[in-house]
Amino acid sequence: MAEPTQPLLTDSNSSSPRSLDDTIESYIGSFGWAQFLQAALVSFSGVFDAQQTFISVFTDSEPTWHCTDSNSICHESISNICILPKTAWSWDYSPHVSVISEWGLQCAGSFVKGLPESSFFVGCLIGGLVLSTLADSSLGRKNMLFLSCLVMAISTMLTVFSPNIWVYAVLRFVNGFGRATIGTCALVLSTELVGKKWRGRVGIMSFFGFMLGFLSLPLMAYMNRGSSWRILYAWTSIPTIIYCVLVRFFVCESPRWLFVRGRREEAISILKRVASIPSTDVSSGGAISMSFSSLPFEEDEEKPSTNVNIFTTMKVLVEKRWALKRLSAVMAIAFGIGLVYYGMPLALSNLDFNIYLSAAFNALMDLPANLITLFLVDKLSRRNALIGFTALGGVSSVLIFALHNMRIGNHGALQLALELISYFSACSAFNMEMIYTIELFPTCVRNSAIAMARQALVLGGVFSPIMVAAGRKNAFWSFGLFGLAIGLLGLFAVGLPETRGSDLCDTMDEEECKDRRSKVAVNNVIA
């Protein structure tokens, strides 16, 4: 799997200095089994991330019911059980199958019913803002991933013992707070362990993990049908705790981050562990130390590395005009994607499909989205692919609204097909956007930039339930706005530079110089 690479010492007299990216790849190779196993283990966190993101679709749903007295006013045409006496109807299953039936919330307001899910997404937003910079500053990628998974696992287990809706909502908030940085850390850590040729493909691995987690939920929920919703939380918490142990003892920290933070000896030790090419220089470590000590940026970064404020990276992103422009664009695009990504599964109830099958179909859409992104990531420009996916998702969503207004017979199958296309487009656009964001920002702020993009995605998830509720009366407020948002906001990619095949930069100055060189090259071509 590894590609032969010449040792760095053979180029020691070269006039053109190597970047940290080239130097690391010269020693460990582009891709090897050690790097693959590391990336696979890190990417598996997406399984537990997805389970906690979508678990409320089943645990917080309103169960089906039936009339118990055929001679009373109760009959099948009545959709609101709150107008019926309690003796006239009964749940089809035990009241413990859902939080709605167990705590008697069937007649509560929409705010109370949606409080746990809203609390989860609010926790994701706050957790992303508070924790995102820690992976770039003090904790690093590995420790942040471990702590995030641990908080999520413990809060999931404690949720099993929730006595009421209020405690349940608080624990869901804590769960979202811990979960907020898992996807970001997994994506950055897995891609920083491999060479640039394989970076796009490895980035897709974390998305496959998320797909498996989403796909496992309908199966687990179906097996748990008729049983307590607490069992579903227990089933998802125990494997997460085991995974935390594996991360703590078997995952390596990013050598790129360690070098940028001035922790050279730790970085060299990790390089020797994950090296995919046989080399006496790698095994000894001496030549590596000499080569990395010659990198000019490391000397600048090493001094302040112990006094970095956790919000320094956010300040740097805002102060640099080019960085702020890029960050604003990727966040706007992510918000549009988030509306569709989280909104479409929630809106399935508006299409009146079986909850287990519809969720499974949506989870399966992640597979073609990941496969297509995997094969196109090295063939199409990041910018054009992102615009294309968002446009396709927008058109499909608007067509659902159009079909709804036509009121033709048997249009449910067409609506479902368009819904799946729209969700598939959102998944593909999300995959491409994350890879694009990795390449748009240097190492010193990369984790924070991706975290902000994911925050915008989650913000779309906060608004989507409100739009879905409004769409039950008028489909424009759900499917219509979903389509317009993702389609129009996707056009922000027009102003971003193309990054396919380019080297990853490590400092803001290095990225700025590369941007200036590309602009000069474009001007020369035009002239």
Curated annotation (Swiss-Prot):
The chain crosses the membrane at residues 28-48, 120-140, 150-170, 177-195, 202-222, 231-251, 327-347, 357-377, 386-406, 416-436, 449-469, 476-496. The keyword Membrane applies. Its main location: membrane. GO terms for molecular function: ATP binding; transmembrane transporter activity. PROSITE patterns: MFS. Weakly expressed in roots, including tips and initiation site of lateral roots, siliques and flowers, especially in pollen and stigma. One of its GO terms (biological process) is monoatomic ion transport. Keywords: ATP-binding, Ion transport, Membrane, Nucleotide-binding, Transmembrane, Transmembrane helix, Transport, Vacuole. GO terms for cellular component: plant-type vacuole membrane. Residues 49-119, 171-176, 223-230, 348-356, 407-415, 470-475 are extracellular. Pfam families: Sugar_tr. SUPFAM superfamilies: MFS general substrate transporter (SSF103473). InterPro entries: MFS_dom, MFS_sugar_transport-like, MFS_trans_sf. Belongs to the major facilitator (TC 2.A.1) superfamily. Organic cation transporter (TC 2.A.1.19) family. High affinity carnitine transporter involved in the active cellular uptake of carnitine. Also transports organic cations. This is Organic cation/carnitine transporter 2. It comes from Arabidopsis thaliana. The lineage of its organism: Eukaryota, Viridiplantae, Streptophyta, Embryophyta, Tracheophyta.
